[in-house]
Regions:
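N-terminal non-cleavable signal-anchor helices
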Residues: 17-20, 55, 94
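Short aromatic-glycine-(Arg/Gly/Cys) micro-motifs in beta-strand/loop hairpins
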Residues: 1-28
């Protein structure tokens, strides 16, 4: 999904950060109203070493889209703008 589509999707979507808590298959989810908030939580969880993904959920259309790549790009962009190093977990992803 590109940024134009993501921006259009933001009008009706909520964002779910899925957190995989290990091999037991038990995880959790955290729903956010904004993509930026979801990216903050995703970044934090990845820093803690919890494998996570970000999904846009459009309750109006009943659709979902994996937007983890867009979350990674936003976090990299933030690091670049702030002139800080990428998180270690993100270096291996990009």
């Amino acid at each position: 999904m590109n940024y134009d589509k993501l921006n259009a999707y933001k009008l009706t979507a909520r964002y779910l950060v899925l957190i995989d808590c290990g091999s037991d298959g038990i995880g959790s989810g955290d729903i956010h109203a904004s993509f930026d908030d979801a990216c903050d939580v995703y970044d934090c969880q990845m820093d803690f070493g919890d494998a996570s993904t970000v999904h846009a959920i459009d309750f109006t259309d009943g659709t979902t889209q994996d937007v983890t790549a867009e979350a990674n790009a936003l976090i990299a962009k933030r690091c670049n703008e702030r002139a800080v190093d990428l998180p270690t977990w993100l270096e291996g992803v990009l």
